[in-house]
Amino acid sequence: MAVIRRRPITPSISDHSIPGPSAGQRRPQQKLWRRSRLLLFLFFSASLFWLYNIASSVFENLPSLASRDTQRFNEGFTKIRLSDLELDIPPGYVIGHADFGDGRSRTCKKEFVQPQSEGCNWVNVNLGNGGSEPNLSGGMIPSVAPPFGMTRWTPQTRENYVSMCPYNQTDTKIHGFIGTHQPAIWMGESGPVEIHASLGEVITDFEKRGLTFKREDEYASPNYYRNLLDVGKDIGDVEIEMSATSRVGHIRYTFDPSSESIKPHVVLQTSRKTWILHGDQPDDKVPYYPNGYIEVDLEKQEVRGWNDERQDHVLVGDELPAKNFKSYFVARFSQPFSEGGISHAGKIQPNVLRGQGKVLAGYVQFPENTKEVEVRVGVSFISLEQASRNIDLEIPSSQSLAQTPQSTRSQWADKLDLLSVEGAAPSNLTVLYTSFAHTLVYPYEMSEPTPQGSMYYSGYLDKVVSGISYSGYSIWDTFRAQSAWLILVAPERVGGMIQSIIQDYKEGGWLPMWKNVVETNIMVGSHADSLIAQAMKVGVKGFDYQEAWQAVRKNAFTPPDRDTELRFADREEGTPQEVRAGLTEYKKLGYVADDLHSESGSRTLDYAYDDHAAAIVADIMGATEDAALLRERSKNYKYLYNNQTGHMEARNSDGSWAGQEKGWTEGDHWAYTLDVMHDVPGLIDLMGGESNFVDFLDRHFERGHNLHTNEPSHHIPYMYILASAPHRTQEWVRRIGESDYNHTADGLSGNEDCGQMSAWYLFSAMGLYPVDPANATYVLGAPFFDKLTLTLPSTGKNVEIKAKGASSGMKYVKNLQIDGVDHEDVVVPHDVLEKGGVWEWEMRGDHQVWGM
């Protein structure tokens, strides 16, 4: 249902009586009054009919606000009664976000939906939070932070660890807010902080402190969260509100005790019992007890602490221990407290004001009749002093809770409003703008503003250093499309993000694969090569090109330590940095041997692509001999093609075939046969020409091998058009866009993977996709909507995608004109897109010859 940005609806005429003529009035006046009354009646009847039609189309099935909210706000509601529809909105409130995918509306104070933003209004922060199993969920949470924020704050309904997020929309209790650094559902948490408020008895145990809520009381957006928690019938309620900046959470608690003698309190959990995954299944978890410190300062009216929780520390433990890693926090309160204590291993210790150890929390109690408390929680990876400084810089005491959501919303609006759409249904707008928001979360900021300039904790050096740093790099996923999307919509960030991975190379010896504070060795390939090639190709500034080439060259020519000893299996613990595991035999044989290394088929194909990316970098840097060698090596994919089966297949070190089912990462031999994004003409020739290739694609799709939940499938529908079958690209891209994405909590068919799933949708909605991202080109598909306009912040120019009829189901392209000139090529270089202009697509309901 549509998001409505309206002022409170005024009372209808039925709520007021219209006075008749008083006694003794003359009949002409009475007649005039009757005529006037008739005119007024006709006018208001017409108005009511008009209002009914609008409301019926927009507000259908919206429930009224809960009755206890009426009591709490104590403001009186205006009401309009239209047929069977009742809509109650308190003065000063709007429908700030009306669609959570659960059929319920949400109201919000107007101050929290400012500034006006079409893009922000359509974001459903619960999209991607559904799914009964980790791999059936988008792994998203209703978090609050600005784009690329260091710490995301979210209500916590469950304890998070690898394979579990801290919030699930099926839960009925909230256990507090958590400031989280968990970048994806299959990655671990690093240094969280939890805060919880209640009435009466102080309870710190996670399960016992949970408070029930009603889903209709919940309001969530990228910049503000609100809910009403029930402490108990004889105890009272707590209204919780939360916003955040990059490094500071801003929380307000409004206490409504059933008795004046009941005191409110706030708990801050610094260390907890959590879990480490030893293996690749959720049941492979074992308990893990991080260390923590807590201090309740009655004089400064602060609570301070730190913990060293890193759930992924076992993956590259010996080489990159990051022994001094700590996440620090400082909490400041708007109201004075005179009592406090700690909880150690579940035991409450009143008046003990500091402690260190496992399963540790601190708490403060407020005097009776304390109705409202604001808390500012600064977070830092540098020090307690820096956590305090972050509060001063981002949310000083003079800043109200209304100002923080407005500031954060403004940052989201600056990005989301770059996109405008015409002809899209409300559900499509929710998918589109939520996808946009999902692409702007990772990687997240690690660097912090200090008196000495920008600094960050380096897990590689295990100390604080100067510079810019990001974490949460899921490069195996995001190199495919999310990186290209950020070049379009966040170019001011990209140079720093590339410099960050170069810093990782300088500090840790290698470019990252999957960085979560430090390298984790998750996934395969050295796809940072592609990020660098792409950035160089489009002319991104802000990073050292020479150092970047040195890093890429090392990836391409230097095997990792113990390369001939280890298999480097998925989530194998205590290994050195993996990078291109199996590079020793890849250089010798042309492929990674399956009897020597895990995931060998995927590695071989990924390394071939990475050689292609490295060759682009070498060309740009003038290293012609290296470029020629790498370009030749990029054809190593041919070593895996089995002419007898017509599929790619992993091989053993003696040259024998390993079997079709062995050696793959998040895919099968069908998907990986098509995993040659950089040389599609060569692959088509290898498979016997376009006709055979298209037949293989048909069987791949029709037999259910294209699992869009896994990234190796993302480019595959765009391969049809490269084999002169454009209509099949147009059909399958549209079908995937409709089947694997929707506006509900179950709106993602698989893990979001740090924005890659959403980047696919955004590009596809525009009618193009970066099949070969390192080369900075786009393969054309067909737009989803009648008109889509993207403003490019680097130039201020607009790319107008016009495709009349696309919104009503026309998916076939008859012709494309760019700025009035016919465009026949199905591949478009980045510089054409960067120039802006009008892309006029002529759409039809049956397939055409364009693109053949």
Q: What residues fall within each predicted segment?
A:
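Membrane-interface motif at the C-terminal end of an N-terminal transmembrane signal
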Residues: 49-70, 79
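Accessory carbohydrate-recognition regions in carbohydrate-active enzymes
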Residues: 86-483, 487-530, 536-605, 617-636, ...
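Mature N-terminal, pre-catalytic/accessory segment of carbohydrate-active enzymes
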Residues: 21, 31-38, 55, 66-68, ...
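Hydrophobic membrane-insertion alpha-helices, especially the h-region
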Residues: 39-53
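ATP-dependent phospho-/nucleotidyl transfer catalytic cores
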Residues: 610
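Short, low-complexity, Lys/Arg-enriched N-terminal segments of secretory-pathway carbohydrate enzymes
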Residues: 1-35, 66-80
